[in-house]
Amino acid sequence: IMFKGTDKFGTSNYEAERPYLKQIEKLYEEYRHITDPAKRKVWYHKIDSVSQIAAQYNIPNEYDKLMAAIGSQGTNAYTSNDVTCYVENIPSNEIDSWAKVQGDRFQNMVIRGFHTELEAVYEEYNMGLTSDGRKLFTALMAKLFPNHPYGTQTTIGRGEHLKNPSIVNIKNYFHKYYVPNNIAICLSGDLDPDKTITTIEKYFGSWKPSTHI
């Protein structure tokens, strides 16, 4: 989701795209409260139809193209029990270009292409169900930490979570935890510390901390 862009990139026309994204968000909120299988199928067809319209404004992989344009390599992300980490290997003379894009996406993330991303996560979840190692680790953590998120919640979530997704909840999570007082920017390499700090302040300095952390 974090690689899909903002209101400034990842879209050919955000003002035209936004109403459809809002509609998709609303449809998902209604979908997650429907229990009848036949009605859920009809509702998901609605979501798919609106998503296809919204996709007309989507510019696929624009984030990757922006990073490639500045010579970045190793674009990646991972989530563990304690951290979600985003990784880039960039030329030292492209710090400003990198920070401009990162400052935008971490403050102004737009959720687009949600249903296709959800399907990819669900496929990963299903693969985990057939992995003996994954099942053993999950059972071990549940025994070791019965009253702690380490044992009660896996990073990918449960099947019922994926079957009843909420873009509203994702946005709430983003606004609560993707905040400067809960994030560390780690840089190493051929850097001028003073210039780098000035650049970080330029693109991240207006980011408001959360009072809920």
Write out the residue ranges for each language-model feature.
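Active-site recognition of the HExxH zinc-binding catalytic motif
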Residues: 1-8
